[in-house]
Amino acid sequence: MHKILRKFFLRQKKRVKKQFNDKIFKKLTHLWTKKALKDGYIYNFTWEGVPIIKFPSDLIVFQEIIQKVKPDLIIETGVAHGGSLVFYASMQRIYNLKARTIGVEIDFREQNRQNCRKLFKKYNIEVINKSSTDPKVEKYLKNKIKKFKRVLVF
């Protein structure tokens, strides 16, 4: 790694530690997050045209996790509109991972399925329209997981 990049990551690590321990930073973050959730801020975003109910900063963290872990299977419980599934699968594609993405949603509505159909096919995404606590879903996923080396669950 180039020394300038090494310095960048060292400074980044120090900043994160400082911010983590900074009481004012924590308080402001808490207040902003509380207000943002109250005002529906997380409903303002899409990924490839699909609503994604996440803070944009969380997406960067998920991207970093996917880059480091390099999962060949990602499972998400609680899919809502499907945007995060598309996000995870597109990140796997960016990192050239021959991977699968599976979502489990108790109520994956038809309009969401129709909206996501092309992207789910493009990215090889599967949605299980059942409860994540259903024993049949658990059994299915346990069998599925056996075929993969690195599994990431959100």
Residue ranges and their predicted role:
Residues 1-43:
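Membrane-proximal basic amphipathic "stem/tether" segments
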Residues 45-47:
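Short glycine/proline- and acidic residue-enriched helix-loop micro-motifs
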Residues 50, 57-154:
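S-adenosylmethionine/decaboxylated-SAM
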